[in-house]
A protein has these predicted regions:
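Surface-exposed loop/edge segments in extracytoplasmic proteins
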Residues: 126-135
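Short, solvent-exposed loop/turn segments in extracellular or other extracytoplasmic domains
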Residues: 137-143
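Solvent-exposed loop/turn segments flanking beta-strands in beta-repeat/beta-sandwich domains
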Residues: 108-127, 154-157
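Long, polar/Ser/Thr-enriched low-complexity segments
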Residues: 1-88
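An aromatic-rich alpha-helical recognition segment common to small helix-rich domains
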Residues: 30, 102-104, 120, 161
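Generic recognition of long tandem-repeat/solenoid scaffolds
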Residues: 1-3, 98-104, 146
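Pro/Thr/Ser/Gly-rich low-complexity, intrinsically disordered linker/stalk tracts
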Residues: 63-113, 137, 173-183
């Protein structure tokens, strides 16, 4: 059994400061997406929830420390992790009128079904705002036009997408689609 924590007069080490900053950055990034991650990130094992698994993944793989501050590595960040076949050639493009054009190849084979649903995650880092588009289209549609809120006009957003099986809990691992300026 552990004893009660005690106040210390020792200054934290650089390593401790780095770990605290990384943890804070990951928590600021993931907390608003908690409800999504709790349904889409990997398979819970033992006492670890999906959200805990996502936090552990991001602390190890998707956060950087430059010696003064921690930052999220968006190209390594994940919002889902699973065995479903990912959409092929998934791409996002800004379209005038606060719209986001999503395109992909219908690759319905293996465990991928034409009825699989596309989920899109849009993150605006300056204000730390999220927009989630659940069931945006089916795999067979191969395209979707999403309307973003007006407050994102002119902002650079980070975008991810993944598929969810309509009839089972299977998810594909999310794909980072890049930084896009909303027009």
């Amino acid at each position: 059994m552990r004893g009660k924590p005690k106040k210390t007069s020792k200054q934290p080490t650089l390593s401790q400061l780095a770990q605290r900053a990384k943890f804070a950055a990951v928590m600021q990034f993931l907390t608003p997406a908690n409800s999504l991650l709790s349904n889409t990130f990997a398979t819970p094992t033992g006492a670890k929830s999906r959200y805990n698994l996502a936090t552990a993944y991001h602390l190890q793989e998707a956060v950087d420390w430059d010696g003064t501050e921690a930052s999220i590595l968006y190209d390594r960040a994940l919002f889902s992790k699973g065995a479903l076949l990912a959409p092929q050639n998934l791409a996002a493009t800004a379209v005038a009128g606060n719209q986001l054009q999503m395109d992909w190849v219908n690759n319905s084979h293996g465990n991928a079904q034409p009825t699989d649903k596309l989920t899109v995650v849009v993150y605006e880092p300056t204000g730390r705002f999220y927009e989630f588009f659940m069931d945006a289209a089916t795999r067979a549609d191969a395209t979707a036009l999403l309307v973003l809120p007006p407050y994102l006009t002119g902002s650079q957003v980070q975008v991810w997408g993944f598929m969810t099986d309509a009839a089972s809990p299977l998810k594909s691992t999310s794909q980072y689609l890049g930084a896009i300026t909303v027009v």
